[in-house]
């Protein structure tokens, strides 16, 4: 079994130019949506007005922006750092995921402090339960990535298989994060501020980057890795 590389997969040779440009445009839009939605949630939260106000801010930074961009780094058409080497992209991926974990930890700390101070019970909604599972899965993914970064120190014998698991589970974790964000939009806090057609638009925004990322991983990496295992 040959060592597996994580790199950019070129587009098919006979692919129409229009299709190629449409795919690139969808990637640019995914970056804009990830950034714009994070800014929107930050403005909506009015950080500093309460302990709770920091929770959506840091969680949006963690999952809607940092994690999304860390995954898109490896996209053949959508990466903002397409000019970087594979080694540099891996380092940037680690930096993005580390920042995501730090922001998620801060977001968790603020919501626990807020509910404790208000004497409210924890884990009473689907949003909180799925969010807790997402945080746990994110931590497991980080450990898996650490093993891939230092396979000899971690005594990993089947690196190719672990990379496949890391890719597949990484997609699942990001989709779990997207579901958590969607469930948060059903909260009293969010629905008190966003109503009508605007609410449905907000519901669609986090789904779009998730679809782009799902297509990226399933099309460009998973079939290739299964063949090389």
UniProtKB/Swiss-Prot annotation:
Cytoplasmic side of membrane: 1-24, 75-91, 150-169, 215-229
Lumenal compartment spans: 46-53, 113-128, 191-193
Binding residues annotated for heme b 2, in chain numbering: 93, 166
Cofactor(s) required for function per UniProt: heme b
A single MF term (Gene Ontology): metal ion binding
Residue intervals passing through the bilayer: 25-45, 54-74, 92-112, 129-149, 170-190, 194-214
Domain spans labelled Cytochrome b561: 22-224
Transit peptide recorded as keyword: no
Superkingdom of origin organism: Eukaryota
Reaction it catalyzes: monodehydro-L-ascorbate radical(out) + L-ascorbate(in) = monodehydro-L-ascorbate radical(in) + L-ascorbate(out); Fe(3+)(out) + L-ascorbate(in) = monodehydro-L-ascorbate radical(in) + Fe(2+)(out) + H(+)
Enzyme's top EC category: translocase
Compartments, record wording: Membrane
Chain positions recorded as heme b 1 binding sites: 55, 127
Membrane-protein topology: Multi-pass membrane protein
Keywords per UniProt: Electron transport, Heme, Iron, Membrane, Metal-binding, Translocase, Transmembrane, Transmembrane helix, Transport
Enzyme Commission numbers on file: 7.2.1.3
Main location: membrane
Cofactor remark: Binds 2 heme b groups non-covalently.
Cellular component terms (Gene Ontology): membrane
PANTHER family, A to Z: OS05G0565100 PROTEIN, TRANSMEMBRANE REDUCTASE CYB561D1-RELATED
Function of the molecule: Probable transmembrane reductase that may use ascorbate as an electron donor and transfer electrons across membranes to reduce monodehydro-L-ascorbate radical and iron cations Fe(3+) in another cellular compartment.
Name of the protein in its database record: Probable transmembrane reductase CYB561D1
Source organism of the structure: Homo sapiens (Human)
